[in-house]
Each structure stands twice: as structure tokens, then as C-alpha cells.
Design a protein with these regions (language model features):
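C-terminal structural segment of proteins
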Residues: 1-126
Length: 126
């Protein structure tokens, strides 16, 4: 978006039976906004991840995709080794801000926990 523009609506196509997505958020509600958040979208066919999209907020100056963690997942069966590697790739790619709401290490840790939980969720991996 350009300065002065705002997002009015978002439309999503219907998920296929092979697709799963989730969004996790950590917030300090006294202040009214999220400290960090993670969106995950996977396509899994025959037990392997054929497509992964991971986006974070609070992991850098702006919301961002984490392509290094996506690359760990794509082409792999999501098991313990792959989850640990994807979380490590995500944390290495982040440059979170440090401010009065949360420091950088806290945000980096929290986003890694969010990815770990999302990848282990039965709703995500059915």
C-alpha cells in the first residue's frame, strides 16, 4: 500500500481439500494491538507439503513472508526434524523490533513457538 491508502476488503478463494491455513496472534490487549502474529498456509498431497506460505507480523519493520522457512517445508513430510528446521529458519530470518511492548528476543521466540504450534496442530495437518 502507498502512504495514505488503506485496505478495504480481502477476498480468498475457497480452500481445496488438500489445503490448510491458520493464523496465530500474541497480543497485549491493554494496548489494543498484537505484539506478533503468524499466518500459515499449506498444501499437503500424499503426505508431503507441496506448497507453504508463512507470513509474520512483528518479526520485522513490516509484515513479511519467510521464504527460507517455506523452503524447508516444501517437498517434505512434516515431521519432528522438518518442524525444528522450519522454526530455526524462521527465527534466523527475523529482525524484530525492540520497543516498550516487547523486546526483539521475545518476539523472535514467540513467532517460533507460533510456527511450531501451527505445524503440530491437527487442524493444520489433519
Amino acid at each position: 500500500l502507498k502512504p495514505g491508502e488503506f485496505l478495504q476488503a480481502v477476498a480468498f478463494k475457497r480452500q481445496l481439500s488438500t489445503e490448510r491455513s491458520t493464523f496465530l496472534e500474541l497480543g497485549n490487549r491493554r494496548h489494543g494491538f498484537a505484539v506478533a502474529g503468524l499466518a500459515l498456509r499449506l498444501e499437503i498431497e500424499d503426505g508431503s507439503c507441496t506448497m507453504a506460505r508463512i507470513a509474520t507480523m512483528g518479526g520485522g519493520a513490516v509484515a513479511q513472508r519467510i521464504s527460507s522457512a517455506e523452503a524447508v517445508l516444501e517437498g517434505a513430510a512434516i515431521d519432528e526434524t522438518v518442524i525444528v528446521a522450519a522454526v530455526a529458519a524462521l527465527r534466523a530470518a527475523l529482525d524484530p523490533p525492540h520497543d516498550v511492548h516487547a523486546d526483539a528476543d521475545y518476539r523472535r521466540h514467540a513467532l517460533g513457538v507460533m510456527l511450531d504450534r501451527a505445524l503440530r496442530s491437527k487442524e493444520t495437518l489433519w
